[in-house]
């Protein structure tokens, strides 16, 4: 590609997926420019690395670019898109450019409705500890690298494969992971679960004959598609029929201990022995994510001690059960602050379970901003059930992400439904344990009314609530 195209322009370059690809291209020697509506940490970093960054969208920003990269969030009437097309400059989707990067190395693609970012980070960390020096492009900041992307000198590139817009079907990886398949972004699949499952089958079948798909057998929908897969597979999970299986699982604060049995390995001689693993992440869902990384690493011949060391020293990913420490309360005492990207009921339930295991004797308070009216509508009942399992709640209005408001699928409706017992119609929590904030900016004030000494506060959501943890941690008290 470099002999033909040297100047590449990104519209929406500050997005997590876009900025990672841009950074790798910069490190490969391409000339990169990009635009976004606001300046953020990602745009500042790219500017320091040599990218030309424009704040705001303007046809002039395209300049002399030879290709323009967009995400599905960029509208077709964006002035830079229109300018590029008028000038006959190719306008390509982010996934197409990611696919081009994967041509340069052996691709390892991590797919699934939930857990992609953490699993991608675990795979990259284990391969790095095994001296394979991978390139990676991740949907969150890998804390040990201080970035969401890195150009390695090794033969492998580890990336997230996005099913939300079916763009993972643009990729041709040599190895794959599927963490789970769940009903989300169903507009892409005409609200048909069979279409979603078929897309994952197609994704797996894109591997070459020498590839391997590492699949979570604990997930019912993943299990359902296995009979339709002809490519080599490894099954992982806690189930008895898993090839990479965890047993003797126990929580120890924010760490998990477990034993791994590896029953099937195709590439490296004798069957490996069991591993006694300490994972520096909480929750059963993260045990499964670690098993996926162990499956990939074992296939590639990474030594046992490197696997054990990488998992025990894993420093986490930004906004995935990210711990901010203890924050003072104005009323006296302190609370523990944790931030998480979870915005689907399944993700929220997994984070809640992890927090219960890590802090069994403490009150769990949720500050939540729902994300998208369509998701709130489609998963309304599931959201309500998860919200009922927290000890206290502060909710705010839905982050629209460009969607129009849907009656009955708003934050206040969620709050009202979550506070009533289905059987008795009585209130579940007293008024001192709940609050509704009209905006994220109002949440600190409402939290000050709800929080008590010793509480664990979990901020959750994929929208503007991402700024709340920094606000709380920088304040003298709440």
From Swiss-Prot:
Annotated pathway: Cell wall biogenesis; peptidoglycan biosynthesis
Pfam families the UniProt entry points to: Mur_ligase, Mur_ligase_C, Mur_ligase_M
GO BP annotation list: cell division; cell wall organization; peptidoglycan biosynthetic process; regulation of cell shape
SUPFAM superfamilies: MurCD N-terminal domain, MurD-like peptide ligases, catalytic domain, MurD-like peptide ligases, peptide-binding domain
Claim: Cell cycle is one of the keywords in the record: yes
InterPro entries (alphabetical): Mur-like_cat_sf, Mur_ligase_C, Mur_ligase_C_dom_sf, Mur_ligase_cen, Mur_ligase_N, MurCDEF_pg_biosynth, UDP-N-AcMur_Ala_ligase_MurC
Binding positions for ATP per the UniProt entry: 112-118
E.C. number: 6.3.2.8
UniProt KW Ligase keyword: yes
Catalytic function, reaction form: UDP-N-acetyl-alpha-D-muramate + L-alanine + ATP = UDP-N-acetyl-alpha-D-muramoyl-L-alanine + ADP + phosphate + H(+)
GO-annotated cellular components: cytoplasm
GO molecular function, one term: ATP binding
Subcellular localization, as worded in the UniProt entry: Cytoplasm
Keywords in alphabetical order: ATP-binding, Cell cycle, Cell division, Cell shape, Cell wall biogenesis/degradation, Cytoplasm, Ligase, Nucleotide-binding, Peptidoglycan synthesis
Entry function: Cell wall formation.
PANTHER family recorded: UDP-N-ACETYLMURAMATE--L-ALANINE LIGASE, UDP-N-ACETYLMURAMATE--L-ALANINE LIGASE-RELATED
Matching HAMAP family: MurC
UniProt family annotation: Belongs to the MurCDEF family.
Name listed for the protein in its UniProt record: UDP-N-acetylmuramate--L-alanine ligase
Chain's gene name: murC
